[in-house]
């Protein structure tokens, strides 16, 4: 099932700031009109790719059309990748300060942020995955507290946290930017027919 250029693509999120950031990163060249929709999806468990695929399939079933689903992981090297895909619950309970304190007993404060966008053209269609990773460190929270764990993640090569960086700077280096760049390049090259060139990451 091809998705014609200009057709609406449902981005599954209830987070206005996330939608704003995604639209800003994608820019005018992205061939679809992005529409946000909050959908109640099961809280899947497992490896990041498996979670993304399951969520995207369920969203496509509910929407009965093309959907885009995002999953974000924050992975601490000292904890062998945890919290990983469960960062949402850790953040809800601990806040950025608590995430920082989790590594108090470890010398290694390094971490990586992983963003996975899953696209599905419709029910029964394969899921394509686009990933982005940004390396960094977990630091004592600094900056505005209005966007998740941004205050405690300092990207490699910068002396400011995600929260302290100007939006245009963050949006040019973030894990979300890298994943969206891969997605946008894939769709723009395919000129509105994402199914004609399969990603190797499909189910």
UniProtKB/Swiss-Prot annotation:
Domain of life the protein comes from: Eukaryota
Alphabetically sorted, this entry's keywords are: Cytoplasm, Hydrolase, Magnesium, Manganese, Metal-binding, Nucleotide metabolism, Nucleotide-binding
Which GO cellular component terms, listed alphabetically, does the Swiss-Prot or TrEMBL entry include? Answer: cytoplasm
Keyword DNA-binding part of the UniProt annotation: no
User: Matching Gene3D superfamilies, A to Z?
Assistant: 3.90.950.10
HAMAP family this protein is in? HAM1_NTPase
Please state what the protein is called: Inosine triphosphate pyrophosphatase
In its UniProt entry, the species of origin is given as Danio rerio
